[in-house]
Swiss-Prot record:
Propeptide: 26-47
UniProt entry tagged with the keyword Membrane: yes
Signal peptide (residue range): 1-25
Family label: Belongs to the MCD family. Mastoparan subfamily.
AXPX repeat start and end residues: 25-28, 29-32, 33-36, 43-46
Pfam families in alphabetical order: Mastoparan
Keywords for this protein: Amidation, Antibiotic, Antimicrobial, G-protein coupled receptor impairing toxin, Immunity, Innate immunity, Mast cell degranulation, Membrane, Repeat, Secreted, Signal, Target cell membrane, Target membrane, Toxin
Protein name: Mastoparan-AF
Functional note: Antimicrobial and mast cell degranulating peptide. Has broad spectrum antibacterial activity against both Gram-positive and Gram-negative bacteria (S.aureus MIC=16-32 ug/ml, S.xylosus MIC=1.5 ug/ml, S.alactolyticus MIC=8 ug/ml, C.koseri MIC=4 ug/ml, E.coli MIC=4-32 ug/ml, K.pneumoniae MIC=32 ug/ml, P.aerugiosa MIC=96 ug/ml, S.choleraesuis MIC=16 ug/ml, S.typhimurium MIC=32 ug/ml, V.parahamelytics MIC=16 ug/ml). Is also active on multi-antibiotic resistant hemolytic E.coli O157:H7. Acts by affecting membrane permeability.
GO molecular function: toxin activity
Subcellular location: Secreted; Target cell membrane
Statement: the UniProt record of this protein carries the keyword Secreted: yes
Amino acid sequence: MKNTILILFTAFIALLGFFGMSAEADPIADPIADPISGPNAEADPEAINLKAIAALAKKLFG
């Protein structure tokens, strides 16, 4: 059961990375953007929240 959940979780993260994270959408990759400011969550509401994903994985897998 745990292996199945781990495989599904890994596949989900891979799909998010494949479809959601491209160089064009990355504010850090923009040379015109202010280098001091980090990624703006308000500018990209569909941005992946890695901290929330890590917390969920930690909660699921102990």
